[in-house]
Curated annotation (Swiss-Prot):
Protein name (Swiss-Prot/TrEMBL): AP-1-like transcription factor napA
Localization of this protein: Nucleus; Cytoplasm
Main location, first listed in the record: nucleus
Residue positions of motif Nuclear export signal: 543-550
Gene field: napA
Domain of life: Eukaryota
c-CRD: region residues: 525-558
Annotated region (Basic motif), positions in chain: 159-180
Region Leucine-zipper: start-end pairs: 182-189
Sequence ranges of Polar residues compositional bias: 26-64, 299-319, 365-377
GO terms assigned for molecular function: DNA-binding transcription factor activity, RNA polymerase II-specific; RNA polymerase II cis-regulatory region sequence-specific DNA binding
Pfam families membership: bZIP_1, PAP1
Amino acid sequence: MADYNSLYQHGLYLSPDQQDLLLAALSSNNPPSKQKQNVQKPELGTNPTNTPGQASTGSFNTSPAFDGSHQFDNLNYDESPFLDFNPELEWDFPGSENLIGELPGSATSDDHEVGEKRKDSNSNGEVNGKKRRESDDKSDDKTSKKPGRKPLTSEPTSKRKAQNRAAQRAFRERKEKHLKDLEAKVEELQKASDSANQENGLLKAQVERLQVELREYRKRLSWVTQGNALSAINSYPGNANRMSGLNNNDFMFDFPKFGDLPGGRIFNGSVAKTNQNKKDDTPIPGILRHSALQAANGRASSSASPKTVTSNNPATKSPVTADGRLTSHTSSVYNYHQPGQGHDTSTSDSPSSSSDSHQFLSSSGTSPEPSVQSPDNQAKESHEGHTCTIDGEKSFCAQLGMACGNINNPIPAVRQRSESATNTPNAPSSTDNVPGIDFMAQQNGGQFDPLLFGDWREPQDAVLSQDFNTFFDDAFPLPDLGSPSHNLTEVGLGAQQKKSILEEMDNKEEEEVVPGEDKAQMLSCTKIWDRLQSMEKFRNGEIDVDNLCSELRTKARCSEGGVVVNQRDVDDIIGRV
């Protein structure tokens, strides 16, 4: 309403020149012919009934206060709309002279564009600030404000913006693709690293397990190759008698193959005839000789049943079954011939009646039985007629040195003496090396390995192939010593090959060496004798030197300088004395 009043007031106070200009501007859009018809002269007269809302020519010269309509009848002087009007207001604005153009009569039809420009400039001059702000807000609009204006479709800025957006979009796509590729690569490398770490862990565990198994096999191989199976056992005075009793024992058992009957392999008549009267050298305990095994397998003599008593009667007593199939030849597995006697002697060395077999071992080596040579009986007999045989340092060292051998005689003297002492007159010593039941234990290095009986299982293929002899082949590393075609050199070659393999493995990796004993803790024979001399009981003769020497021999160790004993063992033994 305020805009309407302002326009209405401008219309009321236009000068005649301004009115002509306004009419010319309004009639410039019409053709000249129509303009002449439409142009009317303004009525100078006043019509009291004209109102500002009616298009009358007389309304330009009359004031709204003198309007004849009844619309303003109730208005007084205080309520007049012209109270705020400034009479000193200048209607002429700077630059208004440039807006006057040619009259409509002098303009031709070709000047249509010029009039349009004048109209446009005139209208732009009359636009207020509000419309200018609206035009600024709509400047980005491509369509023109007037219907005759064509929209701008090809603007360089819009093209650049579109290109920038497309380039940014492509860059983002490439960046996202690159990031996805990197993530996939990292994930793949992570999986490969995890698998490699897992495989390395498994390989390390397997290598450790193989190293443990290799150490165990090296220990077993060292026992077999060095022949130290009985060295530690025979160092005890009582054990020497026991092991010599095993060598003097006439009991021998050859394990036959499961499912086979005794045949020509066990009983070789020709071999028995050639080896029957043959004398061999003194056997070394713990070592089996091929000729002795052949002689033992070929001998045939009469035997007594396991339940009979010792008898010198040359009559043959052989176990006979109900159908009479077994003969006296089958007893050759358990007995052997005494070549020193002129005739066959039936000696009953069975487990139930033999006194030699009772030396701390039963018939099968599993349960102890009462023995004639028990520790109590031996102790009584030794103390009843005891005489001291050591009278000085030299004899003491000689007695103590019997625990070890030398270059000329590698067998300890204690072992030889125990062998000669255990030969009884009822059973004269034989020159043949007849293996007892301990030769099976010697093959395994003198140790009972429970793994052989716990972990080993008979393969199922043996049930179909009737081959049940694989257990003994796996349990004992040595081949069949009882076969005539056996050659002992094969065992040596096999051991050498294994040793060479171990040497090659030692060259590749550092071998774990068990730390040895401290040499400073080992006392020689001279130091032990000096210590005994400092004891008052020894000077008074209250100490049994023979018994003390035998106890020291049990703890003695062989070294390059002679026999040595650990200081702790010496303190323990002397403290008990």
